[in-house]
């Protein structure tokens, strides 16, 4: 009986360890990024920078470009390198929504829309990983 209980405890412990090891690693955007964006229909590329903090799948941060400084909130997908970020300018006069995907740990590409009825593409590169 004692051997049976010890075996059951060992199997239970092995199950917990296996379950902990099998948790998928998700992508992380934490760091400082430089990005470029181009509005659809215009031949002008703008530059900006953003600092992102990610905890679990939640994204927060700030970005700064020719249109001002924006507070960022968003989320990373649990099962893929896709993310969504919403930005709201500090004075509340401009907002954007970015849907993107990490192409590797250091780069992303995506499309954005604004509350000013504009849209375009955005590309970024991580310059500092925190």
Locations of regions flagged by a protein language model:
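Bacterial N-terminal signal peptides that target proteins for export
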Residues: 1-8
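Core hydrophobic alpha-helical transmembrane segments of single-pass membrane proteins
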Residues: 10-15
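C-terminal motif of bacterial Sec signal peptides marking the signal peptidase cleavage site
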Residues: 18-19
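Central antiparallel beta-sheet cores of small beta-barrel/beta-sandwich binding domains
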Residues: 25-130
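Short, conserved catalytic or interaction motifs in soluble domains
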Residues: 22
